[in-house]
Swiss-Prot record:
Family, as annotated: Belongs to the FARP (FMRFamide related peptide) family.
PTM-bearing positions, type Phenylalanine amide: F8
Coiled coil: none
The name this protein goes by in its record: FMRFamide-like neuropeptide FLP2
GO cellular component terms, semicolon-separated: extracellular region
Biological process terms in GO annotation: neuropeptide signaling pathway
Organism: Macrobrachium rosenbergii (Giant fresh water prawn)
């Protein structure tokens, strides 16, 4: 999983 995806 992308770290940026965790932002949502």
């Amino acid at each position: 999983a992308d770290k940026n995806f965790l932002r949502f």
